Amino acid sequence: MPDRSTADTAGTAETVGTAAASDITRQVDALLDRSTDGIVMDSRDRRAVVLSRQTVYQGAVFDVEDMRIALPAGGGDSVTVRRQVCRHAPCVVMLVHDEARDLYLLEREYRVGSDLFAYGLPAGLMDDGEDVEQAALRELAEETGVVPVGQDGVIFDHVGAFYSSEGMSDELANIMVMHLRRWESRPRRFDPDEHVESAWVTWRQLAGVPVTASNSVIAIQHEKIQRILKKQ
């Protein structure tokens, strides 16, 4: 049975931390309000309202919506703006670590956005009904053939969920580090137009190649901090 005093202390610390964060948010909101041009951005009662939306493009990976949105202004008024947004399924991004060998899984493939054969990490879209860990395990198996063995074959270190580019897309990237304790290799399964290379590299090699995808950089920087902390 857990120590009640320890649990109470942890709960109190969490409450205090949440209260402090809320207080900081209020302070920052007050500072930002000084530069307002009339749009009410920190109202708890009034939010942006979607007036209309039209799908103007449908593709294999994303759709594009043209939207008219009413932003709340002072005196109960509103200001209408027009925005386009890429509708994109949420995705998973995984930094995969083989604990026994202290090696990391690096990929290389063509990325049209950067027009590069880019270094990166295993990643992919979540299917309907999947949770984050299910999607990560499926994508890892499909892209690399790496499959954890047993319930304790992998430890997930969830870094967080971040928008890839919130000014133009609703894609939410769920970033994590997967620490493999036991795993086996199986045949990879690619879509016909997927061409991906993968290799196990040392931490020095991983940190030394030019990874340019922001979500991958977040995962690598998180792991860098964890490695530093473990040495202390």
Which residues does each PLM region occupy?
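Conserved Nudix-box catalytic region and its N-terminal flanking loop in Nudix hydrolases
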Residues: 2-3, 17, 22-26, 32, ...
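Alpha-helical and coiled-coil interaction segments, frequently adjacent to or embedded
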Residues: 2-8, 17-61
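Acidic, metal-coordinating catalytic segment for phosphate/diphosphate chemistry
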Residues: 50-95, 99-100
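Short beta-strand micro-motifs in enzyme catalytic cores
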Residues: 63-68, 117, 172-176
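Short loop segments at secondary-structure junctions
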Residues: 72-74, 98-101, 110, 179-184, ...
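Unchanged
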Residues: 80-81, 90-93, 124-216
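Charged, long alpha-helical assembly modules
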Residues: 205-206, 212-232
